[in-house]
């Protein structure tokens, strides 16, 4: 039976959905920290350049494959490749990549909700630094707490996706993303009035090449390149699915620019929130979970109206994580529908059970299944799963999309250019072809190789 392809109701819906997928916790727990380490404004400048020459082109390619095929990532290549070609094998890998990402992202989204709840009801109020750190350890040690929030995330997200594309996912994500952007602005304005704001902002935004040389110029360039590449979550078809839901009114380069601008806005605004607070309370900038769950809660505990600001911050973090979960769930559910021909409701129900089961190792990896053998990856099941997605699926997947679009062995430059340029807006030009065909693939291979080197040999 031929199912009518669902479409998104509005252009804003498409842009916010795609941005929601790209905007994740990395924008907050990674970007400000490595920007501060890498020389502030100097790093930010390189980051922006890499976004334009690295992230942006690959995003247009993923969208083009989705929009031209009108299929989920698992079937998109089949619609576009020439007879006898094997590109569609990557379609199955995009689906595996999506499952792998959700195996740990649902847990991390659960952490955000748990902390929103704890802050909102005042469980972190009046604690000293050690007690705050203790709360995080306590959460990781409790399979029950983490399972509850993880299941909550999965159930809510599946219910939203099961309702349908326009009435479920698009409506909810639109509201969530607008709320996220507004909350960020309120938090940033609050930070800008703190006593340490001036110091914090100059550390974050004024180019400091001396600091950059301390870390090493090459290291800074590579981390700017990595961050620009990984922030957009390209390579597992998460963007491609939304390309398949839109019309041909606007060129894909123009739409991609808007999405990248939103992603960057969130990353930079996160720095505007975090640095003034750290400098005001004389706390070292940290990154990763310790920034979100230890450093910042300590600051909120000492701040006037800290409960309000802390609650708003964790609500924003929960939205950033949930928008990614919703986007990837949509992809998984749609792939399931196309592979089996079942309804949206049925695919949602099966995936509800499947994703909860697949997410359990990550939850248990911090307590009952903690095993020293994972130390090489960083120490927990989550780190192994994160390594597989970030170091294998994203760079290699992006490379496949890239080669598929620019080489004559795939879909080919002319087909890609025609699709990406259909509609009003910025166009991909022929002069870009040499760079996209010969230089960009080498950069992606470098990112892939460097990631492995960094993990196992550095």
Question: Model-found features: residue ranges?
Answer:
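Helix-loop-helix connectors at the membrane interface of multi-pass transporters/channels
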Residues: 5, 75, 109-141, 245-249, ...
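Transmembrane helix-boundary motif of multi-pass solute transporters/channels
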Residues: 13-50, 237-243, 253-257, 261-262
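Membrane-interface "cap" regions at the ends of multi-pass membrane proteins
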Residues: 1-29, 58-63, 67-80, 84-89, ...
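Inter-helical loop and helix-membrane interface segments of multi-pass membrane transporters/permeases
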Residues: 2-6, 34-38, 68-93, 106-166, ...
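C-terminal membrane-solvent junction of multi-pass transporters and transport-like membrane proteins
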Residues: 90-95, 340-352, 384-444
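Loop-to-transmembrane helix boundary motifs in multi-pass membrane proteins
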Residues: 7, 13-15, 21, 147-148, ...
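Membrane-embedded translocation segments of transport machinery
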Residues: 4-8, 170, 174-322, 326, ...
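Select transmembrane alpha-helical segments in multipass membrane proteins
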Residues: 7-18, 43-46, 85-99, 147-153, ...
């Amino acid at each position: 039976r031929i199912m009518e392809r669902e479409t998104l109701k509005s252009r804003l819906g498409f842009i916010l959905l795609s941005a929601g997928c790209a905007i994740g916790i990395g924008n907050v727990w990674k970007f400000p920290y490595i920007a501060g380490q890498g020389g502030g404004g100097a790093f930010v400048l390189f980051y922006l350049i890499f976004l334009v020459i690295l992230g942006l082109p690959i995003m247009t390619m993923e969208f083009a494959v989705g929009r031209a095929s009108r299929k989920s990532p698992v079937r998109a290549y089949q619609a576009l490749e020439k007879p006898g070609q094997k590109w569609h094998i990557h379609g199955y890998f995009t689906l595996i990549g999506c499952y792998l990402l959700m195996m740990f992202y649902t847990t991390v989204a659960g952490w955000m909700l748990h902390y929103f709840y704890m802050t909102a009801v005042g469980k972190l109020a009046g604690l000293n630094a050690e007690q705050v750190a203790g709360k995080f350890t306590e959460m990781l040690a409790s399979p029950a707490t983490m399972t509850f929030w993880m299941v909550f995330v999965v159930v809510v997200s599946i219910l939203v996706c099961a309702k349908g594309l326009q009435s479920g996912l698009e409506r909810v994500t639109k509201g969530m993303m607008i709320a996220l952007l507004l909350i960020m602005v309120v938090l940033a304005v609050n930070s800008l009035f703190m006593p340490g704001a001036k110091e914090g902002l100059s550390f974050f935004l004024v180019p400091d090449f001396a600091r950059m040389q301390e870390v090493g110029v090459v290291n800074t360039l590579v981390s700017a390149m990595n961050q620009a590449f990984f922030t957009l979550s390209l390579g597992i078809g998460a963007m491609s699915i939304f390309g398949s839901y839109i019309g041909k009114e606007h060129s894909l380069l123009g739409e991609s620019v808007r999405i990248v601008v939103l992603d960057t806005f969130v990353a930079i605004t996160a720095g505007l929130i975090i640095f003034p607070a750290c400098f005001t309370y004389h706390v070292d900038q940290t990154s990763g979970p310790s920034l979100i769950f230890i450093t910042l809660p300590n600051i909120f505990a000492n701040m006037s109206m800290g409960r309000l600001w802390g609650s708003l911050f964790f609500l924003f973090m929960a939205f950033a994580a949930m928008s990614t979960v919703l986007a990837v769930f949509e992809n998984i559910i749609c792939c399931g529908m196309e592979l089996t021909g079942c309804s949206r409701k049925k695919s949602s129900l099966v995936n509800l059970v499947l994703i909860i089961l697949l997410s359990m190792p990550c939850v248990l990896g911090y307590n009952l299944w903690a095993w020293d053998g994972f130390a090489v990856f960083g120490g927990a099941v989550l780190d192994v799963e994160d390594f597989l997605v970030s170091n294998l699926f994203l760079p290699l997947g992006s490379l496949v999309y890239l080669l598929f679009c620019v080489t004559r062995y795939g879909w080919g430059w002319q087909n890609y250019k025609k699709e990406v340029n259909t509609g009003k807006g910025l166009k991909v030009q022929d002069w870009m072809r040499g760079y996209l065909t010969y230089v960009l693939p080498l950069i992606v291979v470098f990112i892939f190789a460097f990631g492995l080197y960094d993990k196992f040999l550095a």
